[in-house]
Amino acid sequence: MTDIVDAPHRRAAGEVASSVGTVVLVGAGPGGSDLITVRGALALATADVVVHDRLADAELLDLAPADAEFICVGKAKGSGVTQDEINAVLVEHASAGSSVVRLKGGDPFVFGRGSEEIEALAAHGISCEVIPGVSSALAAPALAGIPLTERGGAASFTVLTGHRVDDHDHDWSALARSSSTLVVLMGASPASSI
């Protein structure tokens, strides 16, 4: 299957790389290297530079060319590279004409700061493509056999972070009264207060 879809993607990436560099935000999926989308894998296969998170499966880096530059900008609780530093790395390499893949755990727009990276790139006139990833908000319940919605049960679901937002806690009591299924991401540390 890769041969069928690979050639047009490589040609398009080559045409872009010959002029101004670009950035592709690729959602790596929920953890396993086999859970990235085909389009995400194809973007990695044509990357000059891969800027990756700590949450992305390390095996995904094998999908990039051996001569690609790999830059880990992984964040851990309380430490790591700042968002401004990540933005600067993306701008620097794209401005130099490189084809940059920004590999992000899960989906770039589900607590992934993808919009901040796009805004920083746009401020420098750099185009950006987004390739969605499978979010753990959907994958974890599915892999555990837990339906987020079902006939006669929950008709909706809510995804939220377990962390405080703007120094305010969620109204957990109100959320608990809802008939909606709740999916709490990044909830391990604050679990005792949820």
Where are the language model's segments positioned?
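Beta-strand/loop-alpha-helix module characteristic of Rossmann-like adenine-cofactor folds
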Residues: 2-23, 100, 119, 126-129, ...
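Class I S-adenosyl-L-methionine
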Residues: 1-33, 38-131, 139
